[in-house]
UniProtKB/Swiss-Prot annotation:
Cofactor binding comment, as recorded: Binds 1 thiamine pyrophosphate per subunit.
Biological classification of the source: Bacteria, Bacillati, Bacillota, Bacilli, Bacillales
Function summary: Catalyzes the thiamine diphosphate-dependent decarboxylation of 2-oxoglutarate and the subsequent addition of the resulting succinic semialdehyde-thiamine pyrophosphate anion to isochorismate to yield 2-succinyl-5-enolpyruvyl-6-hydroxy-3-cyclohexene-1-carboxylate (SEPHCHC).
GO biological process, one term: menaquinone biosynthetic process
Pathway this chain belongs to: Quinol/quinone metabolism; 1,4-dihydroxy-2-naphthoate biosynthesis; 1,4-dihydroxy-2-naphthoate from chorismate: step 2/7; Quinol/quinone metabolism; menaquinone biosynthesis
Protein name from the UniProt record: 2-succinyl-5-enolpyruvyl-6-hydroxy-3-cyclohexene-1-carboxylate synthase
The gene coding this protein: menD
NCBIfam families listed in its UniProt record: menD (TIGR00173)
Listed CDD domains: TPP_PYR_MenD, TPP_SHCHC_synthase
HAMAP family per record: MenD
Protein backbone atom coordinates (compact mmCIF):
# COMPACT_ATOMS: atom_id res chain seq x y z
CA UNK A 1 0.00 0.00 0.00
CA UNK A 2 2.86 2.33 0.86
CA UNK A 3 4.49 1.72 -2.52
CA UNK A 4 1.21 2.47 -4.29
CA UNK A 5 0.82 5.81 -2.52
CA UNK A 6 4.40 6.81 -3.29
CA UNK A 7 4.04 5.82 -6.95
CA UNK A 8 0.70 7.61 -7.28
CA UNK A 9 2.11 10.74 -5.65
CA UNK A 10 5.14 10.82 -7.93
CA UNK A 11 2.99 10.27 -11.02
CA UNK A 12 0.39 12.98 -10.43
CA UNK A 13 2.81 15.54 -8.98
CA UNK A 14 5.12 15.02 -11.96
CA UNK A 15 2.18 15.35 -14.35
CA UNK A 16 1.04 18.62 -12.74
CA UNK A 17 4.62 19.96 -12.85
CA UNK A 18 4.99 19.06 -16.53
CA UNK A 19 1.78 20.89 -17.41
CA UNK A 20 3.16 23.96 -15.64
CA UNK A 21 6.46 23.55 -17.50
CA UNK A 22 4.63 23.78 -20.82
CA UNK A 23 2.73 26.94 -19.90
CA UNK A 24 -0.40 25.83 -18.04
CA UNK A 25 -1.36 28.24 -15.26
CA UNK A 26 -5.05 27.41 -14.85
CA UNK A 27 -7.01 24.17 -14.47
CA UNK A 28 -10.81 23.84 -14.38
CA UNK A 29 -11.87 20.90 -12.21
CA UNK A 30 -15.28 19.25 -12.13
CA UNK A 31 -15.49 17.39 -8.81
CA UNK A 32 -15.56 13.60 -8.67
CA UNK A 33 -13.98 10.68 -6.87
CA UNK A 34 -11.78 9.12 -9.56
CA UNK A 35 -10.08 12.43 -10.35
CA UNK A 36 -8.96 12.87 -6.71
CA UNK A 37 -5.21 12.28 -7.29
CA UNK A 38 -4.80 14.91 -10.01
CA UNK A 39 -7.25 17.35 -8.42
CA UNK A 40 -5.19 17.35 -5.23
CA UNK A 41 -1.94 17.67 -7.20
CA UNK A 42 -3.21 20.76 -9.03
CA UNK A 43 -4.59 22.24 -5.81
CA UNK A 44 -1.24 21.69 -4.08
CA UNK A 45 0.84 23.24 -6.88
CA UNK A 46 1.82 26.75 -5.74
CA UNK A 47 1.66 28.35 -9.19
CA UNK A 48 -1.43 26.76 -10.73
CA UNK A 49 -4.83 28.41 -10.27
CA UNK A 50 -7.71 25.96 -9.94
CA UNK A 51 -11.34 26.68 -10.79
CA UNK A 52 -14.16 24.41 -9.60
CA UNK A 53 -17.25 23.88 -11.76
CA UNK A 54 -19.73 21.02 -11.16
CA UNK A 55 -21.09 21.04 -14.75
CA UNK A 56 -18.56 19.50 -17.14
CA UNK A 57 -20.06 20.98 -20.30
CA UNK A 58 -19.99 24.52 -18.92
CA UNK A 59 -16.61 23.90 -17.27
CA UNK A 60 -15.01 23.03 -20.61
CA UNK A 61 -16.38 26.16 -22.28
CA UNK A 62 -15.24 28.24 -19.28
CA UNK A 63 -11.74 26.90 -19.97
CA UNK A 64 -12.08 27.88 -23.63
CA UNK A 65 -12.80 31.41 -22.43
CA UNK A 66 -9.78 31.35 -20.13
CA UNK A 67 -7.61 30.38 -23.11
CA UNK A 68 -9.05 33.15 -25.27
CA UNK A 69 -8.45 35.68 -22.49
CA UNK A 70 -4.97 34.58 -21.37
CA UNK A 71 -3.65 33.20 -24.69
CA UNK A 72 -2.24 30.22 -22.76
CA UNK A 73 -3.23 26.54 -22.74
CA UNK A 74 -5.66 25.56 -19.98
CA UNK A 75 -6.47 22.07 -18.64
CA UNK A 76 -9.83 20.60 -17.66
CA UNK A 77 -10.21 17.61 -15.33
CA UNK A 78 -13.17 15.33 -14.63
CA UNK A 79 -14.00 11.99 -13.07
CA UNK A 80 -14.65 8.76 -14.98
CA UNK A 81 -17.79 7.76 -16.88
CA UNK A 82 -20.30 9.94 -18.68
CA UNK A 83 -18.82 13.07 -17.07
CA UNK A 84 -16.15 13.05 -19.77
CA UNK A 85 -18.70 12.92 -22.59
CA UNK A 86 -19.99 16.34 -21.56
CA UNK A 87 -16.68 17.84 -22.68
CA UNK A 88 -17.40 16.98 -26.33
CA UNK A 89 -18.99 20.26 -27.54
CA UNK A 90 -16.14 22.40 -26.19
CA UNK A 91 -13.53 20.03 -27.60
CA UNK A 92 -15.18 20.22 -31.02
CA UNK A 93 -15.17 24.03 -30.82
CA UNK A 94 -11.50 23.96 -29.78
CA UNK A 95 -10.52 21.67 -32.63
CA UNK A 96 -12.04 23.88 -35.31
CA UNK A 97 -10.88 27.12 -33.66
CA UNK A 98 -7.33 25.83 -32.97
CA UNK A 99 -7.64 26.31 -29.21
CA UNK A 100 -5.06 24.50 -26.99
CA UNK A 101 -7.48 22.87 -24.55
CA UNK A 102 -5.87 20.07 -22.49
CA UNK A 103 -8.50 17.45 -21.66
CA UNK A 104 -7.76 15.22 -18.66
CA UNK A 105 -10.23 12.39 -18.06
CA UNK A 106 -9.80 10.18 -15.01
CA UNK A 107 -10.56 6.51 -15.59
CA UNK A 108 -11.03 3.20 -13.86
CA UNK A 109 -7.96 0.93 -13.87
CA UNK A 110 -7.65 -1.40 -16.84
CA UNK A 111 -8.93 -4.46 -14.95
CA UNK A 112 -12.26 -2.69 -14.30
CA UNK A 113 -12.93 -1.71 -17.90
CA UNK A 114 -15.62 -3.53 -19.91
CA UNK A 115 -16.61 -5.76 -16.98
CA UNK A 116 -19.68 -3.86 -15.78
CA UNK A 117 -17.94 -1.83 -13.08
CA UNK A 118 -19.86 1.32 -12.11
CA UNK A 119 -19.02 4.70 -13.65
CA UNK A 120 -16.91 3.05 -16.34
CA UNK A 121 -17.33 3.65 -20.06
CA UNK A 122 -14.81 3.31 -22.89
CA UNK A 123 -12.84 6.54 -22.59
CA UNK A 124 -9.89 5.54 -24.77
CA UNK A 125 -10.00 7.51 -28.04
CA UNK A 126 -13.44 8.86 -27.09
CA UNK A 127 -12.62 12.26 -28.62
CA UNK A 128 -10.53 11.02 -31.54
CA UNK A 129 -12.59 12.93 -34.11
CA UNK A 130 -11.84 16.25 -32.40
CA UNK A 131 -8.41 16.15 -30.74
CA UNK A 132 -4.98 16.70 -32.26
CA UNK A 133 -3.34 14.17 -29.95
CA UNK A 134 -4.47 11.60 -27.39
CA UNK A 135 -2.86 9.05 -25.10
CA UNK A 136 -4.03 6.52 -22.52
CA UNK A 137 -1.50 6.95 -19.71
CA UNK A 138 -0.11 3.95 -17.81
CA UNK A 139 -1.29 3.32 -14.27
CA UNK A 140 0.97 4.39 -11.41
CA UNK A 141 3.67 1.88 -10.40
CA UNK A 142 7.26 1.87 -9.17
CA UNK A 143 8.89 1.76 -12.61
CA UNK A 144 10.95 4.58 -14.07
CA UNK A 145 9.23 4.03 -17.41
CA UNK A 146 5.87 5.18 -16.03
CA UNK A 147 7.33 8.58 -15.12
CA UNK A 148 9.30 8.74 -18.37
CA UNK A 149 6.01 8.29 -20.23
CA UNK A 150 4.82 11.61 -18.77
CA UNK A 151 7.94 13.42 -20.03
CA UNK A 152 7.73 11.79 -23.47
CA UNK A 153 4.02 12.34 -23.95
CA UNK A 154 4.04 15.96 -22.78
CA UNK A 155 6.91 16.75 -25.13
CA UNK A 156 5.05 15.19 -28.05
CA UNK A 157 1.79 16.91 -27.11
CA UNK A 158 3.44 20.32 -26.62
CA UNK A 159 3.59 20.86 -30.39
CA UNK A 160 -0.21 21.20 -30.28
CA UNK A 161 -0.17 23.88 -27.57
CA UNK A 162 1.64 26.57 -29.57
CA UNK A 163 2.21 27.64 -33.17
CA UNK A 164 0.47 26.45 -36.35
CA UNK A 165 -0.47 23.03 -34.94
CA UNK A 166 -2.56 24.32 -32.02
CA UNK A 167 -5.56 22.26 -30.98
CA UNK A 168 -7.06 20.22 -28.13
CA UNK A 169 -5.23 17.20 -26.69
CA UNK A 170 -6.57 14.38 -24.52
CA UNK A 171 -4.89 12.37 -21.77
CA UNK A 172 -6.89 9.53 -20.23
CA UNK A 173 -5.50 8.73 -16.77
CA UNK A 174 -6.51 5.50 -14.97
CA UNK A 175 -6.17 5.43 -11.18
CA UNK A 176 -6.43 2.55 -8.69
CA UNK A 177 -7.73 2.87 -5.15
CA UNK A 178 -6.72 4.29 -2.75
CA UNK A 179 -6.84 7.63 -4.54
CA UNK A 180 -5.15 10.04 -2.13
CA UNK A 181 -1.53 11.06 -2.83
CA UNK A 182 0.93 12.16 -0.15
CA UNK A 183 0.29 15.89 0.15
CA UNK A 184 3.44 16.34 2.21
CA UNK A 185 5.67 15.41 -0.75
CA UNK A 186 5.52 18.94 -2.16
CA UNK A 187 9.19 18.79 -3.19
CA UNK A 188 7.92 16.82 -6.20
CA UNK A 189 5.93 19.85 -7.39
CA UNK A 190 8.23 21.97 -9.55
CA UNK A 191 7.81 25.26 -11.40
CA UNK A 192 10.49 25.01 -14.06
CA UNK A 193 9.72 26.14 -17.60
CA UNK A 194 10.46 24.20 -20.78
CA UNK A 195 11.77 25.87 -23.94
CA UNK A 196 8.57 26.33 -25.92
CA UNK A 197 8.45 25.64 -29.68
CA UNK A 198 8.88 28.63 -32.00
CA UNK A 199 7.66 28.80 -35.58
CA UNK A 200 8.94 31.21 -38.20
CA UNK A 201 8.41 31.01 -41.95
CA UNK A 202 8.84 33.11 -45.06
CA UNK A 203 7.71 32.64 -48.64
CA UNK A 204 9.11 33.15 -52.11
CA UNK A 205 6.97 36.01 -53.40
CA UNK A 206 8.14 35.65 -57.00
CA UNK A 207 5.50 32.98 -57.69
CA UNK A 208 2.76 35.50 -56.89
CA UNK A 209 4.19 38.56 -58.62
CA UNK A 210 2.20 38.19 -61.84
CA UNK A 211 -1.01 37.90 -59.80
CA UNK A 212 -0.33 40.73 -57.36
CA UNK A 213 0.59 43.12 -60.17
CA UNK A 214 -3.02 43.09 -61.35
CA UNK A 215 -5.21 46.05 -60.48
CA UNK A 216 -8.40 44.84 -58.84
CA UNK A 217 -7.42 43.07 -55.64
CA UNK A 218 -9.06 42.53 -52.26
CA UNK A 219 -7.79 41.48 -48.85
CA UNK A 220 -10.43 39.57 -46.89
CA UNK A 221 -9.65 38.97 -43.21
CA UNK A 222 -11.55 36.61 -40.91
CA UNK A 223 -11.10 35.63 -37.28
CA UNK A 224 -7.44 35.89 -36.27
CA UNK A 225 -5.07 36.89 -33.47
CA UNK A 226 -4.82 40.64 -32.87
CA UNK A 227 -0.99 40.45 -33.09
CA UNK A 228 -1.30 39.60 -36.79
CA UNK A 229 -2.85 42.81 -38.12
CA UNK A 230 0.10 45.23 -38.39
CA UNK A 231 1.54 44.09 -41.71
CA UNK A 232 -1.93 43.73 -43.27
CA UNK A 233 -2.56 47.43 -42.68
CA UNK A 234 0.92 48.37 -43.90
CA UNK A 235 0.60 46.35 -47.12
CA UNK A 236 -2.90 47.69 -47.79
CA UNK A 237 -1.70 51.27 -47.32
CA UNK A 238 1.31 50.90 -49.63
CA UNK A 239 -0.52 49.04 -52.40
CA UNK A 240 -3.99 50.67 -52.18
CA UNK A 241 -5.91 47.48 -51.48
CA UNK A 242 -9.30 47.45 -49.73
CA UNK A 243 -9.55 45.25 -46.62
CA UNK A 244 -12.89 43.52 -46.05
CA UNK A 245 -12.58 43.04 -42.29
CA UNK A 246 -14.67 40.52 -40.35
CA UNK A 247 -15.70 41.77 -36.87
CA UNK A 248 -13.45 39.07 -35.33
CA UNK A 249 -10.39 40.19 -37.33
CA UNK A 250 -9.50 42.94 -34.79
CA UNK A 251 -9.12 45.29 -37.77
CA UNK A 252 -12.33 47.25 -37.28
CA UNK A 253 -10.87 48.84 -34.16
CA UNK A 254 -8.58 50.91 -36.41
CA UNK A 255 -9.85 54.08 -38.05
CA UNK A 256 -8.14 53.21 -41.34
CA UNK A 257 -9.58 54.42 -44.67
CA UNK A 258 -8.91 51.07 -46.37
CA UNK A 259 -10.88 48.98 -43.86
CA UNK A 260 -14.31 48.14 -45.30
CA UNK A 261 -16.95 47.15 -42.73
CA UNK A 262 -20.25 47.29 -44.65
CA UNK A 263 -19.44 44.58 -47.19
CA UNK A 264 -22.00 42.06 -45.91
CA UNK A 265 -24.84 44.52 -46.38
CA UNK A 266 -23.39 45.62 -49.73
CA UNK A 267 -23.22 42.06 -51.09
CA UNK A 268 -26.61 41.26 -49.55
CA UNK A 269 -28.03 44.26 -51.40
CA UNK A 270 -26.74 43.24 -54.82
CA UNK A 271 -23.09 44.36 -55.05
CA UNK A 272 -21.17 42.34 -57.65
CA UNK A 273 -17.80 43.66 -58.87
CA UNK A 274 -15.21 42.01 -61.08
CA UNK A 275 -12.06 41.24 -59.07
CA UNK A 276 -8.65 40.00 -60.26
CA UNK A 277 -7.34 38.46 -57.05
CA UNK A 278 -8.32 37.92 -53.41
CA UNK A 279 -5.99 37.39 -50.46
CA UNK A 280 -7.96 35.53 -47.78
CA UNK A 281 -6.41 35.75 -44.31
CA UNK A 282 -7.37 33.82 -41.17
CA UNK A 283 -10.53 31.83 -40.53
CA UNK A 284 -13.56 31.96 -42.87
CA UNK A 285 -15.60 35.13 -42.48
CA UNK A 286 -19.02 35.25 -40.82
CA UNK A 287 -20.79 36.85 -43.79
CA UNK A 288 -22.81 34.28 -45.74
CA UNK A 289 -23.18 36.66 -48.69
CA UNK A 290 -19.43 37.26 -48.95
CA UNK A 291 -18.79 33.52 -48.78
CA UNK A 292 -21.32 32.96 -51.55
CA UNK A 293 -19.55 35.58 -53.67
CA UNK A 294 -16.19 33.88 -53.05
CA UNK A 295 -17.65 30.62 -54.34
CA UNK A 296 -18.73 32.11 -57.65
CA UNK A 297 -16.02 34.69 -58.44
CA UNK A 298 -13.36 33.96 -61.05
CA UNK A 299 -10.75 35.89 -59.04
CA UNK A 300 -7.45 34.15 -58.22
CA UNK A 301 -7.66 33.25 -54.52
CA UNK A 302 -4.71 33.11 -52.11
CA UNK A 303 -5.31 31.67 -48.62
CA UNK A 304 -3.07 32.59 -45.67
CA UNK A 305 -3.56 30.70 -42.39
CA UNK A 306 -1.13 30.16 -39.56
CA UNK A 307 -1.97 26.52 -38.93
CA UNK A 308 -1.22 23.15 -40.46
CA UNK A 309 -4.83 22.24 -41.28
CA UNK A 310 -6.06 24.74 -43.83
CA UNK A 311 -9.73 25.74 -43.60
CA UNK A 312 -10.60 26.14 -47.27
CA UNK A 313 -14.29 27.04 -46.80
CA UNK A 314 -16.15 28.39 -48.71
CA UNK A 315 -14.04 27.25 -51.68
CA UNK A 316 -10.58 25.78 -52.18
CA UNK A 317 -8.09 28.56 -53.01
CA UNK A 318 -5.79 28.54 -56.01
CA UNK A 319 -2.82 28.55 -53.62
CA UNK A 320 -2.45 28.44 -49.83
CA UNK A 321 0.30 29.30 -47.35
CA UNK A 322 0.85 28.01 -43.81
CA UNK A 323 2.33 31.19 -42.40
CA UNK A 324 1.48 34.10 -40.12
CA UNK A 325 -0.16 37.11 -41.75
CA UNK A 326 2.68 39.37 -40.63
CA UNK A 327 5.32 37.10 -42.19
CA UNK A 328 3.31 36.69 -45.39
CA UNK A 329 2.77 40.38 -46.09
CA UNK A 330 6.29 41.25 -45.00
CA UNK A 331 7.56 38.81 -47.65
CA UNK A 332 5.53 40.58 -50.37
CA UNK A 333 6.94 44.07 -49.87
CA UNK A 334 8.54 45.29 -53.10
CA UNK A 335 8.30 48.14 -55.57
CA UNK A 336 5.27 48.10 -57.86
CA UNK A 337 3.93 50.31 -60.61
CA UNK A 338 0.29 49.25 -60.29
CA UNK A 339 -2.04 52.21 -59.84
CA UNK A 340 -5.05 51.10 -57.80
CA UNK A 341 -6.25 54.49 -56.59
CA UNK A 342 -9.51 54.45 -58.57
CA UNK A 343 -10.22 50.85 -57.48
CA UNK A 344 -9.70 51.71 -53.82
CA UNK A 345 -11.73 54.90 -54.10
CA UNK A 346 -14.70 52.95 -55.51
CA UNK A 347 -14.75 50.78 -52.37
CA UNK A 348 -14.24 53.76 -50.09
CA UNK A 349 -17.17 55.53 -51.76
CA UNK A 350 -19.42 52.49 -51.26
CA UNK A 351 -18.29 52.24 -47.64
CA UNK A 352 -18.99 55.91 -46.96
CA UNK A 353 -22.47 55.77 -48.49
CA UNK A 354 -23.20 52.45 -46.81
CA UNK A 355 -22.33 53.89 -43.41
CA UNK A 356 -24.57 56.87 -44.07
CA UNK A 357 -27.51 54.58 -44.88
CA UNK A 358 -26.85 52.53 -41.73
CA UNK A 359 -26.71 55.66 -39.59
CA UNK A 360 -30.01 56.94 -41.01
CA UNK A 361 -31.60 53.53 -40.51
CA UNK A 362 -30.50 53.27 -36.87
CA UNK A 363 -31.92 56.71 -36.08
CA UNK A 364 -35.39 55.40 -36.95
CA UNK A 365 -35.15 51.67 -36.19
CA UNK A 366 -36.79 50.00 -33.21
CA UNK A 367 -35.65 46.42 -33.91
CA UNK A 368 -32.80 44.30 -32.54
CA UNK A 369 -30.23 46.03 -34.73
CA UNK A 370 -31.12 49.32 -33.02
CA UNK A 371 -30.43 47.72 -29.64
CA UNK A 372 -27.13 46.32 -30.95
CA UNK A 373 -26.16 49.70 -32.37
CA UNK A 374 -26.79 51.29 -28.97
CA UNK A 375 -24.74 48.60 -27.23
CA UNK A 376 -21.78 49.27 -29.52
CA UNK A 377 -22.06 53.00 -28.73
CA UNK A 378 -22.15 52.30 -24.99
CA UNK A 379 -19.17 49.92 -25.00
CA UNK A 380 -16.02 51.71 -23.85
CA UNK A 381 -12.57 51.13 -25.32
CA UNK A 382 -11.58 49.45 -22.05
CA UNK A 383 -14.13 46.70 -22.64
CA UNK A 384 -14.45 43.86 -25.13
CA UNK A 385 -17.61 42.32 -26.57
CA UNK A 386 -18.28 38.60 -26.62
CA UNK A 387 -20.99 37.87 -29.17
CA UNK A 388 -23.26 34.85 -29.27
CA UNK A 389 -23.86 32.96 -32.49
CA UNK A 390 -27.08 33.16 -34.53
CA UNK A 391 -28.46 36.70 -35.05
CA UNK A 392 -26.28 38.70 -32.58
CA UNK A 393 -23.00 38.05 -34.43
CA UNK A 394 -24.65 38.91 -37.76
CA UNK A 395 -25.97 42.21 -36.46
CA UNK A 396 -22.54 43.07 -35.05
CA UNK A 397 -21.00 42.15 -38.42
CA UNK A 398 -23.25 44.75 -40.05
CA UNK A 399 -23.12 47.49 -37.41
CA UNK A 400 -19.62 47.52 -35.90
CA UNK A 401 -17.95 50.32 -37.84
CA UNK A 402 -14.39 51.16 -36.78
CA UNK A 403 -14.69 51.40 -33.01
CA UNK A 404 -11.66 50.66 -30.84
CA UNK A 405 -13.03 47.57 -29.12
CA UNK A 406 -12.11 43.91 -29.48
CA UNK A 407 -14.82 41.42 -30.46
CA UNK A 408 -14.78 37.70 -29.69
CA UNK A 409 -17.06 34.76 -30.45
CA UNK A 410 -17.08 30.96 -30.66
CA UNK A 411 -16.97 30.65 -34.45
CA UNK A 412 -15.41 27.21 -34.71
CA UNK A 413 -18.46 24.97 -34.66
CA UNK A 414 -20.78 28.03 -34.49
CA UNK A 415 -22.96 26.40 -31.84
CA UNK A 416 -25.12 28.16 -29.28
CA UNK A 417 -23.93 25.96 -26.41
CA UNK A 418 -21.38 27.17 -23.87
CA UNK A 419 -21.57 30.85 -24.82
CA UNK A 420 -22.14 32.15 -21.28
CA UNK A 421 -19.34 29.97 -19.90
CA UNK A 422 -16.84 30.99 -22.57
CA UNK A 423 -17.56 34.66 -21.99
CA UNK A 424 -17.16 34.25 -18.22
CA UNK A 425 -13.83 32.52 -18.76
CA UNK A 426 -12.67 35.49 -20.81
CA UNK A 427 -13.99 37.86 -18.14
CA UNK A 428 -11.36 36.51 -15.75
CA UNK A 429 -8.69 38.20 -17.90
CA UNK A 430 -10.60 40.99 -19.73
CA UNK A 431 -13.56 43.28 -19.10
CA UNK A 432 -16.31 41.60 -21.11
CA UNK A 433 -19.87 42.43 -22.08
CA UNK A 434 -21.79 39.47 -23.47
CA UNK A 435 -24.42 39.97 -26.20
CA UNK A 436 -26.63 36.90 -26.43
CA UNK A 437 -30.08 35.74 -27.57
CA UNK A 438 -32.64 34.12 -25.31
CA UNK A 439 -32.24 30.54 -26.62
CA UNK A 440 -28.44 30.64 -26.38
CA UNK A 441 -28.74 32.09 -22.88
CA UNK A 442 -31.17 29.39 -21.79
CA UNK A 443 -28.84 26.74 -23.20
CA UNK A 444 -26.00 27.70 -20.83
CA UNK A 445 -27.63 29.24 -17.76
CA UNK A 446 -25.66 26.73 -15.65
CA UNK A 447 -22.53 28.62 -16.64
CA UNK A 448 -23.59 31.62 -14.54
CA UNK A 449 -22.60 29.66 -11.44
CA UNK A 450 -18.93 30.58 -11.99
CA UNK A 451 -19.78 34.26 -11.63
CA UNK A 452 -21.62 33.61 -8.36
CA UNK A 453 -18.94 31.36 -6.85
CA UNK A 454 -15.91 33.40 -7.95
CA UNK A 455 -17.26 36.95 -8.08
CA UNK A 456 -16.48 37.28 -11.80
CA UNK A 457 -17.97 40.56 -13.01
CA UNK A 458 -19.65 40.51 -16.43
CA UNK A 459 -22.58 42.36 -17.96
CA UNK A 460 -24.99 40.40 -20.14
CA UNK A 461 -27.13 42.08 -22.79
CA UNK A 462 -29.93 39.62 -23.50
CA UNK A 463 -31.92 39.99 -26.73
CA UNK A 464 -35.20 38.29 -25.91
CA UNK A 465 -37.46 37.71 -28.90
CA UNK A 466 -38.87 34.56 -27.27
CA UNK A 467 -37.41 32.10 -29.74
CA UNK A 468 -35.06 31.58 -32.65
CA UNK A 469 -35.08 34.82 -34.61
CA UNK A 470 -32.59 33.71 -37.25
CA UNK A 471 -35.06 31.19 -38.70
CA UNK A 472 -37.23 34.08 -39.89
CA UNK A 473 -34.54 34.73 -42.54
CA UNK A 474 -34.50 31.16 -43.86
CA UNK A 475 -36.72 29.48 -46.51
CA UNK A 476 -38.48 27.39 -43.84
CA UNK A 477 -40.51 30.44 -42.86
CA UNK A 478 -42.31 30.53 -46.21
CA UNK A 479 -42.32 26.83 -47.10
CA UNK A 480 -43.48 25.44 -43.75
CA UNK A 481 -45.79 28.15 -42.42
CA UNK A 482 -48.14 25.75 -40.60
CA UNK A 483 -45.29 24.22 -38.61
CA UNK A 484 -42.82 27.10 -38.45
CA UNK A 485 -43.53 28.50 -34.99
CA UNK A 486 -43.47 25.15 -33.19
CA UNK A 487 -40.47 23.64 -35.00
CA UNK A 488 -38.32 26.72 -35.62
CA UNK A 489 -39.72 29.70 -33.71
CA UNK A 490 -39.45 27.64 -30.49
CA UNK A 491 -40.90 30.15 -28.00
CA UNK A 492 -40.15 29.31 -24.36
CA UNK A 493 -41.95 32.08 -22.46
CA UNK A 494 -39.23 32.09 -19.78
CA UNK A 495 -38.90 34.93 -17.29
CA UNK A 496 -35.16 35.48 -16.97
CA UNK A 497 -35.51 37.79 -13.98
CA UNK A 498 -35.67 34.61 -11.88
CA UNK A 499 -32.41 33.43 -13.45
CA UNK A 500 -30.76 36.67 -12.38
CA UNK A 501 -31.97 36.19 -8.81
CA UNK A 502 -30.79 32.56 -8.74
CA UNK A 503 -27.23 33.50 -9.68
CA UNK A 504 -27.16 36.88 -7.88
CA UNK A 505 -27.08 39.11 -10.97
CA UNK A 506 -28.78 42.48 -11.02
CA UNK A 507 -31.57 42.63 -13.60
CA UNK A 508 -33.00 45.37 -15.78
CA UNK A 509 -35.65 44.96 -18.48
CA UNK A 510 -36.11 47.32 -21.45
CA UNK A 511 -39.17 47.25 -23.69
CA UNK A 512 -37.96 49.85 -26.19
CA UNK A 513 -34.80 51.22 -27.77
CA UNK A 514 -35.51 54.66 -26.31
CA UNK A 515 -35.43 53.18 -22.79
CA UNK A 516 -32.12 51.45 -23.48
CA UNK A 517 -30.58 54.64 -24.88
CA UNK A 518 -30.87 56.21 -21.44
CA UNK A 519 -29.35 53.22 -19.64
CA UNK A 520 -25.80 53.01 -18.30
CA UNK A 521 -23.83 49.76 -18.44
CA UNK A 522 -22.31 49.46 -14.97
CA UNK A 523 -18.81 48.00 -14.63
CA UNK A 524 -18.89 47.43 -10.86
CA UNK A 525 -21.67 44.85 -10.73
CA UNK A 526 -22.85 41.92 -12.84
CA UNK A 527 -26.12 42.82 -14.52
CA UNK A 528 -28.44 41.16 -17.03
CA UNK A 529 -29.95 43.80 -19.34
CA UNK A 530 -32.95 42.14 -21.00
CA UNK A 531 -34.07 43.78 -24.24
CA UNK A 532 -37.56 42.74 -25.33
CA UNK A 533 -37.87 42.47 -29.13
CA UNK A 534 -40.27 41.09 -31.73
CA UNK A 535 -39.08 38.55 -34.29
CA UNK A 536 -41.46 39.52 -37.08
CA UNK A 537 -40.86 43.24 -36.66
CA UNK A 538 -37.11 42.62 -36.61
CA UNK A 539 -37.29 40.75 -39.93
CA UNK A 540 -39.38 43.46 -41.62
CA UNK A 541 -37.12 46.31 -40.52
CA UNK A 542 -34.00 44.50 -41.72
CA UNK A 543 -35.60 44.20 -45.18
CA UNK A 544 -36.02 47.99 -45.27
CA UNK A 545 -32.28 48.46 -44.70
CA UNK A 546 -31.41 45.97 -47.44
CA UNK A 547 -33.67 47.79 -49.89
CA UNK A 548 -32.14 51.19 -49.07
CA UNK A 549 -28.64 49.84 -49.65
CA UNK A 550 -29.68 48.17 -52.89
CA UNK A 551 -30.94 51.52 -54.19
CA UNK A 552 -27.69 53.20 -53.09
CA UNK A 553 -25.55 50.63 -54.92
CA UNK A 554 -27.65 51.00 -58.07
CA UNK A 555 -27.28 54.79 -57.98
CA UNK A 556 -23.51 54.63 -57.25
CA UNK A 557 -22.48 52.06 -59.84
Amino acid sequence: MGNHKAALTKQVFTFASELYAYGVREVVISPGSRSTPLALAFEAHPNIKTWIHPDERSAAFFAVGLIKGSERPVAILCTSGTAAANYTPAIAESQISRIPLIVLTSDRPHELRSVGAPQAINQVNMFNNYVSYEFDMPIADDSKETIDAIYYQMQIASQYLYGPHKGPIHFNLPFRDPLTPDLNATELLTSEMKILPHYQKSIDASALRHILNKKKGLIIVGDMQHQEVDQILTYSTIYDLPILADPLSHLRKFDHPNVICTYDLLFRSGLDLNVDFVIRVGKPVISKKLNQWLKKTDAFQILVQNNDKIDVFPIAPDISYEISANDFFRSLMEDTTVNRVSWLEKWQCLEKKGRKEIKCYLEQATDESAFVGELIKKTSEKDALFISNSMPIRDVDNLLLNKNIDVYANRGANGIDGIVSTALGMAVHKRITLLIGDLSFYHDMNGLLMSKLNNIQMNIVLLNNDGGGIFSYLPQKESATDYFERLFGTPTGLDFEYTAKLYQFDFKRFNSVSEFKNATLLSETSTIYELITNREDNFKQHQILYQKLSEMIHDTL
